[in-house]
Amino acid sequence: MLEYAGANIDLLAISDRGEVIKYPARRHALGYRYLDEPLQAERHYIPIDGKCFLLATDGIVSQIGGTSRRVMGSRHFQALLAEAKTADPRKLANSLMRGLRVWQGGEERRDDVMILAFRPPPPSR
């Protein structure tokens, strides 16, 4: 079982069949002194079942590019995930980075980009 609680970065789970499940993070910033209340993050308990898990910063979806020179957006990012058709973490991250480079074209990178893809080992019995 994987326990996840996030702030501003959703966790995505990708099955061996390529199905994507989103576990939403709280829309809450971390580490700012002016925040009075501590984060009350919702916890998700997720069966591992051979899934690949993915965390990605918003620098991907906010990247300008494409023929229309618009932000990539979450719909296009979801399409890249569907095109990848893999639950192998390395292949998935490489596929997403290729898709980002194609989308970006000659545009400048607007923000930092981080993709973390991992597959936990099956639980020992």
Task: Name each model feature, range by range.
Residues 1-125:
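Conserved subregion of the PPM/PP2C metallophosphatase catalytic domain
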